[in-house]
């Protein structure tokens, strides 16, 4: 009927039966009036660098971001993860729900069966953004339960999308142990998160990020897993369709949570030198890549 609908993800358009036309470009101003739609570009053109965490976790798997199916991207992450860190096991189990597509890809690549060894309560929200540790821990208990009849006596690979503080992972590994799993291996379909985000996402300060404070061995011991592996940064880029991996001179995505390569300079608002205090952003004076 000539109406326009704007949404942050394409899945919202699917739900109401709207047709996806295109994404609004970086720096573009779209004005919609009774006379129609007009597009303006008042700012200089910049290189498009989507946040790679949209593909890993934030976007819904049934959305299209930057022309890519989020679901297929996550399956590809799992396939690349299986190539990098295969381990002998009886089954591949996703940490639901965000770990499901990557676990499917891991299973397809490794040839190890995919099973639903964890049942999720869908009425509990995301745990990593809960403000208090006690609330996060209790939320994990409410959110997940082991499929005991399936995992007892089995060697399992748990596939998750990422690890922030490790709150969920510790509880999940112990849950699998309590359910009788003989071995529990953690495989993470993203690189270690070593730097906080200062662009509106409620990630912790750096000293609360598990991968920023512990070595790989220390993280595995902390989680209680028999082994722990993360997808490499280059593996992440290969999974996203870049065979040569990350272009370090001109990165294809913003990936500062993994690399510390922030797209803008960071200024300490209160004058403190401690990195975790950095909060105020300013446009970088460095040449645009």
Predicted regions and their residues:
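PRPP-associated nucleotide enzymes
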Residues: 1-289
């Amino acid at each position: 009927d000539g109406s326009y609908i704007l949404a942050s993800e394409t899945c919202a358009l699917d739900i109401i039966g709207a047709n996806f036309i295109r994404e609004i470009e970086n720096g573009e101003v779209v004005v919609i009036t009774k006379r129609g739609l007009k597009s303006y570009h008042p700012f200089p053109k910049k290189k498009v660098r989507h946040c790679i965490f949209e593909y890993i976790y934030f976007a819904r798997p049934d959305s299209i971001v930057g022309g890519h199916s989020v679901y297929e991207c996550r399956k590809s992450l799992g396939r690349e993860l299986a190539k990098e860190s295969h381990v002998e096991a009886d089954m591949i189990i996703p940490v639901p729900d965000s770990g499901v597509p990557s676990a499917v890809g891991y299973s397809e690549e490794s040839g190890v069966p995919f099973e639903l060894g964890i049942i999720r309560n869908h009425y509990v929200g995301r745990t990593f953004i809960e403000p208090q540790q006690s609330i996060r821990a209790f939320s994990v208990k409410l959110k997940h339960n082991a499929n005991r009849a399936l995992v007892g006596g089995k060697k399992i690979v748990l596939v998750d999308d990422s690890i922030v503080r490790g709150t969920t992972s510790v509880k999940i590994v112990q849950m699998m142990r309590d359910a009788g799993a003989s071995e529990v291996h953690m495989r993470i379909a993203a690189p270690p998160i070593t730097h906080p985000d200062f662009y509106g996402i409620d990630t912790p300060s750096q000293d609360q990020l598990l991968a920023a404070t512990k070595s790989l061995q220390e993280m595995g011991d902390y989680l209680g897993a028999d082994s722990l592996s993360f997808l490499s940064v280059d593996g992440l880029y290969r999974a996203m369709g870049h065979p040569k991996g990350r272009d370090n001179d001109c990165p294809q995505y913003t990936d500062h949570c993994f690399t510390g390569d922030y797209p803008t300079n960071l200024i300490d608002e209160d004058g403190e030198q401690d990195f975790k205090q950095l909060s105020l952003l300013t446009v970088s004076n460095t040449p645009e890549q």
